Amino acid sequence: GEEAEKVLYDSAGKPVLVFYTPLELDGLNWAQITKIDFEECFSNKAQGETDDFLTKFNNEYGYYDLFLMTPDGYCFHSVTKKADYRTNLLTGKFANSGLGKLVKKVLSNRQYEVADFEPYEPSQGNPASFIAQPVISDGKVQLIVAMQISLEKINDVMQLREGMGECGESYLVGQDYHMRSSSFLDPQNFSVKSSFKNNNLAKSEMISAALRGETDIVIGSNYTKTITKEDNIVLSAYTPLKFGDETWALVSEIDKSESFAMIYSLQWVMACIGL
C-alpha cells in the first residue's frame, strides 16, 4: 500500500527514477510502476531547441564541462561526455583524480568545495580544476553538481591588454609554482599546459611573497629567469588570491624600462606645460 519515488539501477547499471503507487481494480491489488532514465530528467530539450538546459547553462557561463553525479559517485550526466562520463568517481579508474577526490570531499563535508588544477586524464592529461556543490534534501545528499573550469576563460581575463603596454602581463601561480593562467609573454614555456607538462616552475621573490600572503609593489627579477637564466627586471605588483582552501599568487608586471619610460614621458609633458 505504499507509494514513493526512488533512484534505482537497471540491469545495465544506469540509474533510473522509479515511481510506484498501489492501484486497486475490482477488489484486486495492483502496482503501478513508472521508470525514466535519470539523465533524461535533467536533459530534456524544449521543442525547437538544439541544446538542453544544462548544456546552455554550461556554455553561457563558460565552463568546460558540467557533471551530475549520484550520491554513490556515479557520473550519469556530462555535457562533453568524455571518458569520465558513466563512470564511478568514487570507485572507478578516476577515483584518485582531481574530480574523484573532490566528489569524496563534497560527500564528506556536505558543502561547496573546489579542486585545484592538476593533470586530468579524461582531458587528454591537461591540467583541470573543478568546483562542486551537493544538493541536499531531507538531510541527505541527493545529487552532486560539478563543473570543470575553463582555462580559456581564465586566460581571457588575465590577458586583457589595456594599460599593460608592450611588455606587461598579469598572471596566476599556484602553491606548486605551476601557472594557473598562461603567460602572455612566454606561452611556449609558461602556458598552464606546458608549465605542468614540462615542470616549468614560475619562481620569483614576488611570487613567493604573494603565496606567503603578502601584498606589495616592488622592482625585481621575474619568473622567466628559471628558463632564460637571465634577469628580466620588472615593476611588479602582487597579492595573494584565495581559491577554496588554496592560495594563488596574483601578479601584474611591466618591464622596468617601459614603466619608467612612461614616467619620463609624463614628466616631459608636465615640464612643457609649465613652460
Where are these regions (language model features)?
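Conserved beta-strands of PAS-like sensory domains
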Residues: 15-46, 123-159, 235-239, 246-262
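N-terminal membrane-entry
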Residues: 261-275
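Generic detector of intrinsically disordered, low-complexity, polar/charged segments
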Residues: 10, 83, 89, 95-97, ...
